[in-house]
């Protein structure tokens, strides 16, 4: 028979699958040389160890790598050996002999084959603790994974929030820039509107050429200007004024004049500085003299008022005023009556400010013609006109276009002074403000 490599012979016998500690313990107990320190009991179910000190020093080193009795006892306990307590040892009196007895169910004298049934104890508590630890570890790992996933989600959310915050800050910056630009634009618009309002105010833009009244006694003042009057281009070009006679020789010495009556002349474009100078001169002349309306008699009411003013008392003009014949002819031919129709045909000119005198100038020619018609009876009393013309027809039905130019001039010299004098007195009693024209914007 072949020997089992795991078997060890014990006293001529063999045992298989027996731990080395049990084999050494069986040899140690069976050795008769060590019976004084370790031996079987009388029954053969246990063994005794005497004098543990000597046994640890003399016997243990021969079979084991240590000489510690506590380690030997611990190994016995690992294989299921138990300590047997005697009645003598349990008493209060210490026994005279140091004797320790150990026993096991399968460690019997003469039954070596039972050693195979002796197994090393496995700690059940340790296995349970190990299982608990593994469960805890798995739970811990799961919780760690959950925490990691939550942390990743939080990081992603934080990243999104950072991006959104950056976008919001950019939008805020752009909105601030737009707001500042809008504020600048609004400030510019407000400044522009205020400048336009100030420029359109009467104190700034309304400073037009307000010439003095040519038919004034020095006491009346021009009325306030009006805004947004529509006037045609023709009415601006055909402006006329009536100037009172003056006795100043320096201003009228070179002009050829006609004795008697005021001067009616066309007004061209005059700069603002010259208009202001004329206004100041006219105001000074009003303070110095009275107005001369008519030298020769025209009508009873007008004659009485004109005779009280001497001709040489005024310093404005030294010679009688001049009445242009072409002007009188245009009045007689009815140009003033067609002036409204021509205004309607011409494009309208929007004027921000026009003095009140301009409106009176627009209607001055028509008023003159009406005055001429109203004073037809006074003109019939004129002897020079009665000798040359027949007044069977009304004045508005006369055909001045077919009349001889010489007759027209004589008629004008005879009729106009009386009509103009009456017209001037009516303008003083009412609110007639002739003007010297104005410059276009």
UniProtKB/Swiss-Prot annotation:
Tell me the null mutant phenotype.
In knockout animals, the eye lens grows normally, but during lens differentiation, denucleation is impaired and the degradation of mitochondria and endoplasmic reticulum is suppressed.
Give the DNA-binding residue ranges.
Answer: 17-121
Look up the domain of life of the source. Eukaryota
- Per the UniProt record, one Pfam family is HSF_DNA-bind
Question: Mind naming one GO cellular-component term on file for this protein?
Answer: nucleus
Which keywords, in A-to-Z order, does the entry hold? Activator, DNA-binding, Nucleus, Stress response, Transcription, Transcription regulation
Main location group? nucleus
Q: Which GO terms describe its molecular function?
A: DNA-binding transcription factor activity; sequence-specific DNA binding
Database matches in InterPro entries: HSF_DNA-bd, Vert_HSTF_C, WH-like_DNA-bd_sf, WH_DNA-bd_sf
Q: Does the keyword Transferase apply?
A: no
Q: Does the keyword Transcription regulation apply?
A: yes
Locations listed in the record: Nucleus
Q: Which GO terms describe its biological process?
A: lens fiber cell differentiation; lens morphogenesis in camera-type eye; maintenance of lens transparency; regulation of cellular senescence; regulation of lens fiber cell differentiation
Extract the SMART domains matched here. Answer: HSF (SM00415)
Q: Where is the signal peptide?
A: none
Tell me the segments the record calls region Hydrophobic repeat HR-A/B. 130-205
Q: In which tissues is it expressed?
A: Predominantly expressed in the eye.
**Family under the similarity heading:** Belongs to the HSF family.
Q: What does this protein do?
A: Heat-shock transcription factor that specifically binds heat shock promoter elements (HSE). Required for denucleation and organelle rupture and degradation that occur during eye lens terminal differentiation, when fiber cells that compose the lens degrade all membrane-bound organelles in order to provide lens with transparency to allow the passage of light. In this process, may regulate denucleation of lens fiber cells in part by activating dnase1l1l and dnase2b transcription. May be involved in DNA repair through the transcriptional regulation of rad51.
Q: Under what name is this protein listed?
A: Heat shock factor protein 4
Annotated source species: Danio rerio
